[in-house]
């Protein structure tokens, strides 16, 4: 993250095919509407396969049965993933009841998947149900616009802060930023909601006709919680409060975790501090960061197109000066803040307004009725009686927010009867995985289906070494794109091949340091053997309050990553 070797502001060369597709799409319409009526295939063809991502969907198939279907000369069982736009993760109980019904009646898997980007996904939507899902969302005030592809994705906001008033203010800014950076094209409304075509020319004053060079992620974070993992994101607004009231933000730009195995031109990167801005400049600054990345981001190589690479190429100070010029402001020096953790506080927490918040641990965010644990039914029953709202956290958990004292017992009874309040270890509470197999086309190794039994084994090691009341931030991601945020964990597993992972160590508990690869392409028994030895050493040799990741660095087990653009692969 230095100013060495600043490169050109704009990368010249042959544009990627994605740029052609966006330019020719007529502001994201393509021929999606016509494709919907093609019953010969369960999928979308040509450019539409990628264009539907701008409308919040990915085309997938069930990889567990892919080979079997190929033998039967059948096409893969195509189905869509849909990701809702839900700034800050807040969803009403009426909206919850609607999504519960749709998941149960109209998806292959019948589940609601909470994600670590504070929203929910439906997996397994057949083509005939694609239009109905958008119409269902619209009927309850939701949409899936811009939750995938080259736009500003779902805006995150710290979900369970210590001060409810501060959360309310920060959440409003998350919503404002999300709305301000949305695409202006009417394609979504025309295709999915049957709204009339208006005889005006589409314009995209912020995103431009070819949108952004690559995905773009934004957060609003309230210290001391770093639950949203700001360093995984392109643009981050750190809330600065005086006397409990929000007065402005520190801006950090250029975080991101995605890498490619063996490609040393790719790297995870923590975000760079730009400085402090008063509240009234928030939207202008957000727009300036996005338009600078729009104009300077690399459109000739998608693997080098994210904001983190733009910052490294042009230099942090050059990018920052351009943001100041476009926004018409000068950043003040960053105000002090600190992070103390990023896990959710599971169980009841009292807010300052005498209401209570109940955070429920949802392993891997997968809401389904399991034998003896009817999680989905339990949450539906709570949604029917709860007067407040639900909040999805960036740790894939769910908060029943704003519960009056008089309603606590009733809600707790349902939660306990449904298995939503079963006791779990601190280690399980602080472990996370992406979806991976069977639905993700990029998956190289299991993640969500691997994690529960893997954590059983880790729990046994924690007991063996006398540290079962503590935790290590542990994450599994099925491929190096990094949706499981393993590259900000104390122990990160990155899928390499079926049953094999790269083991990364040396991140820290608060998520401000990238971990380094410790062992490559190893199996679960090999991972457990390494961690058995290292957890044993941590238990015996650590200093007071020292987290596992900090210990591995101090003990010389792993070298810290100091400047990931230059030393991640050393």
Swiss-Prot record:
It holds the Pfam family NIR_SIR. This is Sulfite reductase [NADPH] hemoprotein beta-component. It is an enzyme of class 1 (oxidoreductase). Siroheme binds at residue 483. Keywords: 4Fe-4S, Amino-acid biosynthesis, Cysteine biosynthesis, Heme, Iron, Iron-sulfur, Metal-binding, NADP, Oxidoreductase. Belongs to the nitrite and sulfite reductase 4Fe-4S domain family. Its cofactor is siroheme; [4Fe-4S] cluster.
């Amino acid at each position: 993250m230095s100013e060495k070797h600043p490169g050109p502001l704009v990368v010249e060369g042959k544009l990627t095919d994605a740029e052609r597709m966006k330019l020719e799409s007529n502001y994201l319409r393509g021929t999606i509407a016509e494709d919907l009526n093609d019953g010969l295939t369960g999928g979308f063809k040509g450019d539409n396969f990628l264009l539907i991502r701008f409308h919040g969907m990915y085309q997938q198939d069930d990889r567990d049965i892919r080979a079997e279907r190929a033998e039967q000369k059948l096409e893969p069982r195509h189905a869509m993933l849909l990701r809702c736009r839900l700034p800050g993760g807040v969803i009403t109980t009426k909206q919850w009841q609607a999504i519960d019904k749709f998941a149960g009646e109209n998806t292959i898997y019948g589940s609601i998947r909470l994600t670590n980007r504070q929203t929910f996904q439906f997996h397994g939507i057949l083509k005939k149900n694609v239009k109905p899902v958008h119409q269902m969302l619209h009927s309850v005030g939701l949409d899936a616009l811009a939750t995938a592809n080259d736009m500003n994705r779902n805006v995150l906001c710290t979900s369970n802060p210590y001060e409810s008033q501060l959360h309310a203010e920060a959440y409003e800014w998350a919503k404002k930023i999300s709305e301000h950076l949305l695409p202006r094209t009417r394609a979504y409304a025309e295709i999915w909601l049957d709204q009339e075509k208006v005889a005006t020319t589409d314009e995209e004053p912020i995103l431009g006709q070819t949108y952004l060079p690559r995905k773009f992620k934004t957060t609003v974070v309230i210290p001391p919680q770093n639950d949203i993992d700001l360093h995984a994101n392109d643009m981050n607004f750190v809330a600065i409060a005086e006397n409990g009231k929000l007065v402005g933000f520190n801006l950090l730009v250029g975080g991101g975790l995605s890498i490619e195995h063996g490609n040393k031109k790719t790297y995870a990167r923590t975000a760079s501090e730009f400085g402090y801005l008063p509240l009234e400049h928030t939207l202008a600054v957000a727009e300036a960061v996005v338009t600078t990345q729009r104009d300077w981001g690399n459109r000739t190589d998608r693997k080098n197109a994210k904001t983190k690479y733009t910052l490294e190429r042009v230099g942090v100070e050059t990018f920052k000066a351009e943001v100041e010029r476009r926004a018409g402001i000068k950043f003040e020096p960053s105000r002090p803040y600190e992070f103390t953790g990023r896990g959710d506080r599971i169980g009841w927490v009292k807010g300052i307004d005498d209401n209570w918040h109940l955070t429920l641990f949802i392993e891997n965010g997968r809401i389904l009725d399991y034998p003896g644990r009817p999680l989905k039914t339990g949450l539906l029953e709570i949604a029917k009686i709860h007067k407040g709202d639900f909040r999805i956290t960036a740790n894939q958990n769910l908060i029943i927010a704003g519960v009056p004292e008089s309603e606590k017992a009733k809600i707790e009874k349902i939660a306990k009867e449904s298995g939503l309040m079963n006791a779990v270890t601190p280690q399980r509470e602080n472990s996370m995985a992406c979806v991976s197999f069977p639905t993700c086309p990029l998956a190289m190794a299991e993640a969500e289906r691997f994690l529960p039994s893997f954590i059983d084994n880790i729990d046994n090691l924690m007991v063996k070494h006398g540290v079962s009341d503590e935790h290590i931030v542990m994450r599994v991601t099925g491929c190096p794109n990094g949706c499981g945020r393993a590259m900000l964990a104390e122990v990160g597993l990155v899928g390499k091949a079926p049953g094999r992972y790269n083991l990364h160590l040396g991140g820290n508990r608060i998520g401000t340091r990238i971990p380094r690869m410790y062992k490559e392409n190893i199996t679960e028994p090999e991972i457990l053997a390494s961690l058995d030895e290292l957890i044993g050493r941590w238990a015996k040799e650590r200093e007071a309050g020292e987290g596992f990741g900090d210990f591995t660095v101090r003990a010389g087990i792993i070298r810290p990553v100091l400047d990931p653009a230059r030393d991640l692969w050393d």
